[in-house]
Amino acid sequence: MRMIASHNIFGVFAHHRAQCEGIAKAVKVLLNAVDIKCIVVTGESVKNGKKVPHAWNMVNIDGQPYHLDVTWDIGAIGSSFKRIPYDYFNLSDQLIIKEHKADTQLPTCSSMRHNYFAVNKNTFWMKNRALAYVEKALQNGDTEFYFRIEGDNVAFDVAESVYHHLKDIFSEKGITDKRIKRIANNYVGTCCIKIY
């Protein structure tokens, strides 16, 4: 019974466990209930070089379609950072096709206007802008920095640059009791850096 439930909304709401299909169906029900158009997309995903069947969502916001993969956000950086990640929140085709392939033809998703990072103004085109964002946030007392960098396969390098920049700042100030953790997703360009 649990195996069947994991592929539908019952698994999500009754057992708090589900496979991607159950999660995508639950997202559809919840978003449709608040008048956000949403469909379940089936296809395959590639993670660590393996292709596996997968389901995610396509939402329509202000007349623009976006890909939304709550399953992958649940399993992304949040577990190690104790936070809710938004790596796969309202993506364009250009980003989603790096790891997802739909079984059927879908509407073209070309906008990033309602992407989590665009809405929060945490998308940067250059490394120095990301560094400036981190420095300003650090001055404001923030200890966690979550942003997106444009460009192919640059997130890891930017996260490393921020990491070393923060280490230099701490070294200059004689701070020795701080640790820095960083995680980057090169596929969608997200970086999460935490000082603890």
Language-model features and meaning:
Residues 1-12:
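Secondary-structure boundary elements
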Residues 3-5, 21-25, 110-111:
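Generic detector of short, locally flexible boundary/turn motifs and exposed helical patches
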Residues 11-12, 92-196:
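N-terminal accessory/pre-domain segments preceding catalytic cores
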Residues 14-22:
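Soluble non-cytosolic domains of exported or imported proteins
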Residues 21-94:
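Hydrophobic/aromatic-rich core segments of domains that either
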